[in-house]
Regions:
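Conserved class I S-adenosyl-L-methionine
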Residues: 1-39, 52, 76, 83-85, ...
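C-terminal alpha-helical "lid/dimerization" subdomain adjacent to the S-adenosyl-L-methionine
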Residues: 2, 18-22, 141-199
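Class I S-adenosylmethionine-dependent transferase superfamily signal
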Residues: 33, 57, 130
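Class I SAM-dependent methyltransferase SAM/SAH-binding core
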Residues: 44-100
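A short acidic, Gly/Pro-enriched loop at the edge of an enzyme's catalytic core
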Residues: 99-110
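A short glycine-rich, Lys/Arg-flanked "PGG" loop and its adjoining helix->strand segment in the class I
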Residues: 124-136
């Protein structure tokens, strides 16, 4: 088990509390993604975590498969779904490795992967797999933390690393857009959202021809 999987397995029960600091940013990203969703779409979500994006978007499409590499994260997501009491037709959960997906080529209309590419040792492999399972012209939603500014950002990053979390790439907003564009996608949106401490790149891209 790699170090980051150990981290997520260990801290899954308190992840949602930790992420409360970016709730407003997540809400804004959901608002920006909704216009790109259609009722007949089949969507795959990678690295769903505790379901913070899952539960605000999954009811907008035909089917939504929420997956994560860390089984404890999936457990928390399922528990949150059951406690919520709202039935989302077409929502399913499964444990999957984003770099080695079991699905057939061109299986999905869109793929969501939030705050995960920067913590993968080989994000290129994940993007290759995402391209493979996306239909021609399929969409990628990849909101991702990018490099912030100031002492508060440095302190937050250092604190997270102290507890065992590792970011393999630390791109600026523009660098992340270039990275996505270099791996088989046409970038449609990449606006930076949030403050200096925990900014997010609202990445929306389309599978290149």
């Amino acid at each position: 088990m790699n170090d980051n999987k150990k981290f997520w397995q260990r801290y899954a029960p308190i992840y949602s509390l930790f992420m409360k600091s970016v709730d407003k940013s997540y809400d804004e990203i959901c608002t920006r993604i909704v216009p790109y969703l259609k009722k007949d779409m089949k969507v795959l979500e990678l690295a769903c975590g505790t379901g913070m994006f899952t539960f605000c978007l999954a009811d907008k499409v035909k089917s939504w498969e929420a997956t994560d590499y860390a089984e404890n994260m999936l457990k928390e997501a399922k528990t949150a779904y059951e406690k919520n009491g709202k039935v989302i037709n077409g929502l399913s959960f499964s444990a999957q490795d984003a770099t080695n997906l079991p699905y057939a080529d061109e299986s999905f209309d869109a793929v969501m992967i939030a705050n995960a590419l920067h913590i993968m040792p080989e994000p290129e492999k994940a993007l290759s797999e995402i391209r493979r399972v996306l239909k021609t012209g399929g969409l990628l939603y990849a909101p991702t933390f990018v490099h912030g500014e100031g002492a508060a950002f440095v302190f937050r990053s250092g604190l997270i690393e102290f507890f065992g979390f590792k970011a393999y790439i630390k791109p600026t907003n523009e660098e992340f857009a270039q990275f996505i564009g270099q791996h088989g996608f046409d970038v449609m949106e990449y606006e930076k959202i949030g403050g200096k401490i925990a900014p997010l790149c609202c990445m929306i891209a389309r599978k290149s021809e």
